[in-house]
């Protein structure tokens, strides 16, 4: 009593305290960072190693395996996967959430150092690592184009100047440069000229290497001066290499230009990048796992003017893709929904109270509670994201409930003629415990969520804490500011009512009268209502089992990614043509804004594309509808497939795949894996629940297998090393020397001129100089025949692995796809040596599915414990919790009606309903218990009176919560797919709960009261017998 009076009788202090809370919230709002979702990125580190010319199997056994054994000992590694392709190995380490990325990086470097002695000696550089997830979509893509500069020169500017500077920006984890390679001097050899001049490839290589050296020359010094010695020992350009003497043939000098074409070109000619049909260099920027995407993008944009000044004016640098505009638009939509919710809630209050002064009270209480929450969010290190703003939108209906309960009860006393200050004090004292019970039991719902681990726990922690803080502030406001404003603003006698007020009042009285009559009938047919309650419990179970489920709603971020997979024996020239064809098809789609892509590198038969769609206001289709439309057109392209997927804000795992979801096959028997993977992939591709089924197992690449005749080699004076060196010199784009420049180092690359390697007959022209200096044709000691070889070798841990990726057709949920895969694997009879499991997002979905029911039950148990402690009763909490089945049925039926799968967002909606719908029961039970204790009423009369007295506040609070969630349910625009499931769940649950709990709660109350009396009667004879003894 003294607590309430302290604020009611000191209005100035109460007002100033509320203003202070609001100002702190405004300051917190201005300081809060902006993000699409809470920080849920797993710490990921990528280790890269190269050995030019080495086959995928050689890279896997000699490079990947030693590194994996060393890296596998690092603590906190969640998953380790590797991909070895021609000349390169990439290992992805995914760590637990609790691992600091910098500490993990130090452990990774130590593991690389430990494995160094086990790696091949011919590696041009030590393995390196990057703190970025290569499977994440870039947060920004920059393109460089020019009509005057070559692709190699553009790549040089991009990698030497731009990428280095951008990588130093805070928040940037990795900058990949694609579309070409660094400038180089290329020596294209003529095999016939070499044979005619009697010059071997090794001779040319040695001559070039010896002619271009960089060694210290020292200095000459006398008593007065010191001269630094400098020589022309380095050759920089193709023109300087052409006159180089590589051999003497019968005393005549053989120059390099006599046996080769020397050009200023690039290190690897098998790379291509394009943007909107124009050759381009791409800078793909990815953020650090812990970095804020909006802040990082803003820093990059701020640096772009300075970056443009560092490159020539003839180079055009453009932003081809930027993730931030759709994120900002989505957050603006949520903020708009929040404002609409506040307006609707206040409108509900006005319609019920029919007083401008009375409406002003919740109109002040709601903003104070919501704005004050921003201060707590800042102190907790949260961000303004879709989920935290959705929490505040939903909180609108909650925070007004507390004010409504207090305001309505005070208004009732005022209408009875009690003086304002006394009415405020008396009214808040009566409902203080009710408000406390409602708030604490609602916060209790989120305790299991706060303790939940893994990605779901991390994802919804900000949501739960934000909502809990808003409820906590609302609790304090409703017990302090609200009664103070009621005492000083409201009048003891209501003013003369207008015609509209009279009409609304008559409507409410009519509803209340109808409810009284129907409630009387229900109480006389309690068994029927009990059967209805049991039916809703059974219906909940059936609906939950049958409803389609997914991990997270499919987002439309306005960005698509595409992976090209062509025939495994395709040439680079043909692959570049496929890239151009695919880009032409996509550019013609009316929903597409721009498209960039690249191909080449270690895997010639693959490529990547990044597509920006037009803003939602300029297109009528969703991202998935655009993909469905393009899929039909892209399927007509022979010899290659392009798999498109919408970029999501959440992507789990470090695997780079050509679809959104993955199923991984593991085996210690590589032969068994290669035998069963095609069978499994073909079976899954036939399933109607899956789309775009593809695999990273590529073991059917074209290979020319050379078999050496070692006896002939010994007789001819040739070693295996000589023969292998010949092949590497001729066909491996061998880097034979280094050109040192002030800003970078460039290579001299040697290979046989591509004009002479158009078919396998090029091998007939190859020869080796034997120990006597005679040219020996390769065909004299080797035979060759076509064969198949893997283009890549994949590991997970230390086991051979193959990942089958898939997308979902429109209208199919992840649970339906997962069930279909599980059934197919069982029917195929896959041997135990080949193990299958979901990976990435699909794996987290499976884990979440197993914990959903436990989480809901834990929330119910927590609420029961809190209510039991508050009421000092085992029974009354059960009465209150009897409201939940009807809400669950309403929520699940609403999801079915809107064809929305049950996702994590819908799960949060169910948990919110646990907190919302029990408020009705709390208000009924509180007044019934008070009436029984003070009015000497029977249980039936007490609950009947409580239901009628609390009918208006119950209707007000329910409608306030419903209208608070309504903007989410009918949301459109950017990010609507995230908001809609939450709104649908809450609105559906509230409607069904309101229809049923007004009748089931009093029936359950009377049922438990009869049980209490029965046990009391049984206990009395026992007590009497004990006393007589």
Curated annotation (Swiss-Prot):
It is found in: Cell inner membrane. One of its GO terms (molecular function) is xenobiotic transmembrane transporter activity. Keywords: Cell inner membrane, Cell membrane, Membrane, Transmembrane, Transmembrane helix, Transport. GO terms for cellular component: plasma membrane. It comes from the Bacteria. The chain crosses the membrane at residues 15-35, 333-353, 360-380, 387-407, 431-451, 469-489, 528-548, 853-873, 897-917, 953-973, 984-1004. It is a multi-pass membrane protein. Signal peptide: none annotated. SUPFAM superfamilies: Multidrug efflux transporter AcrB pore domain, PN1, PN2, PC1 and PC2 subdomains, Multidrug efflux transporter AcrB TolC docking domain, DN and DC subdomains, Multidrug efflux transporter AcrB transmembrane domain. Its main location: membrane. PANTHER family: MULTIDRUG RESISTANCE PROTEIN MDTC (PTHR32063:SF34), PTHR32063. Belongs to the resistance-nodulation-cell division (RND) (TC 2.A.6) family. MdtC subfamily. Part of a tripartite efflux system composed of MdtA, MdtB and MdtC. MdtC forms a heteromultimer with MdtB. This is Multidrug resistance protein MdtC. The lineage of its organism: Bacteria, Pseudomonadati, Pseudomonadota, Gammaproteobacteria, Enterobacterales. The gene is mdtC.
